[in-house]
From Swiss-Prot:
Pathway: tRNA modification; tRNA-queuosine biosynthesis. Catalyzes the NADPH-dependent reduction of 7-cyano-7-deazaguanine (preQ0) to 7-aminomethyl-7-deazaguanine (preQ1). GO terms for molecular function: preQ1 synthase activity. It comes from Prosthecochloris aestuarii (strain DSM 271 / SK 413). The active site is at residues 31, 38. This is NADPH-dependent 7-cyano-7-deazaguanine reductase. One of its GO terms (biological process) is tRNA modification.
């Protein structure tokens, strides 16, 4: 996945804590074991610092996963790592919710806080 696709813009309120939630209900990837498509919802929830994510670039970034054979856990943590690199947010949580396969659903959540790094 090309994290270079992610673009940002200046946060107009960097002195204020506020939460941005972005939901993509049409995320697709491929199961690396079966080659079958996986369908899920990706939710990003973050408190920005100096910059915010530009949504069109995020859309194209997500499309990079469409034909990739990758496990749910890897998707969630890859998105988290790439978003941290692009945004340097105060906090960030990535939640991926996957449609049922064989009657089983899965939800993966990964979080980051800049306060933990201080």
């Amino acid at each position: 996945m090309k994290k270079e696709l992610l673009e940002v813009f200046d946060n107009q309120f960097p002195d204020r804590d506020y939460t941005i939630e972005i939901v993509n209900p049409e995320f697709t990837s491929v199961c690396p074991k079966t080659g079958l498509p996986d369908f899920g919802t990706i939710t990003l929830r973050y408190v920005p610092d100096k910059v915010c994510i530009e949504l069109k670039s995020l859309k194209y970034y997500y499309l990079e996963f469409r034909n990739a054979g990758i496990f749910y856990e890897n998707i969630t943590n890859t998105i988290l790592d790439h978003m941290i690199s692009a945004l340097h947010p105060r906090t960030l949580t990535v939640t991926t919710e996957w449609k049922a396969r064989g009657g089983i659903t899965e939800t993966v959540t990964a979080s980051y806080s800049s306060a933990d790094k201080a």
